[in-house]
Curated annotation (Swiss-Prot):
Membrane topology designation: Peripheral membrane protein
Pfam family name, one: UCR_14kD
A Gene Ontology molecular function term of the record: ubiquinol-cytochrome-c reductase activity
UniProt function note: Component of the ubiquinol-cytochrome c oxidoreductase, a multisubunit transmembrane complex that is part of the mitochondrial electron transport chain which drives oxidative phosphorylation.
Subcellular locations according to the entry: Mitochondrion inner membrane
Gene: QCR7
Assembly description: Component of the ubiquinol-cytochrome c oxidoreductase (cytochrome b-c1 complex, complex III, CIII), a multisubunit enzyme composed of 3 respiratory subunits cytochrome b, cytochrome c1 and Rieske protein, 2 core protein subunits, and additional low-molecular weight protein subunits. The complex exists as an obligatory dimer and forms supercomplexes (SCs) in the inner mitochondrial membrane with cytochrome c oxidase (complex IV, CIV).
GO process annotations (BP): mitochondrial electron transport, ubiquinol to cytochrome c; mitochondrial respiratory chain complex III assembly
InterPro entries with a match to the protein in the record: QCR7 (IPR003197), QCR7_sf (IPR036544)
Entry similarity comment: Belongs to the UQCRB/QCR7 family.
Top-rank taxon, per record: Eukaryota
Protein name: Cytochrome b-c1 complex subunit 7
Residues that span the membrane, as ranges: none
Organism per entry: Candida glabrata (strain ATCC 2001 / BCRC 20586 / JCM 3761 / NBRC 0622 / NRRL Y-65 / CBS 138) (Yeast)
């Protein structure tokens, strides 16, 4: 069973709260982000999350219209850059301070709603 975004967020919070793990994992993650190169294509981290599951589809529907258009523009521009085998100019790269999780709150909200729906669907009533 794949991990939920809620469990991944909890693991991330645990790592950041633990000083030893934070000293090890944060520099490694920064290097990973640097070498992955998605910021050089103008993408943010949340643009990389696969859209093919119902939770993500629900989260994308809840995304504000302006942010949704910006997301689609970033993805189309990145595809165009890949097709032409060129990176964006350095001034158009996404900076670290601009790469904030804009979609994660909606994903966590959609997961909570799906879990609540599943719990209610599997509810068993008993007589006392």
């Amino acid at each position: 069973m794949p991990q939920s975004f809620t469990s991944i967020a909890k693991i991330g919070d645990f790592i950041l709260k633990t000083p030893l793990l934070s000293k090890i994992c944060v520099p490694v993650s920064k290097q990973y982000i640097k070498y992955s190169g998605y910021r050089k294509l103008g993408l943010r981290f949340d643009d990389l999350i696969a859209e093919e599951n119902p939770i993500m589809q629900t989260a994308l529907k809840r995304l504000p219209e302006g942010e949704s258009y910006a997301r689609n523009y970033r993805i189309i521009r990145a595809h165009q850059s890949e097709l032409t085998k060129h990176l964006l100019p350095r001034n158009e790269w996404v900076k670290a301070q601009d790469d904030v999780p804009y979609l994660l709150p909606y994903i966590l909200e959609a997961e909570a709603a799906a879990k609540e729906k599943e719990d209610l669907d599997n509810l068993e009533l008993s007589k006392k």
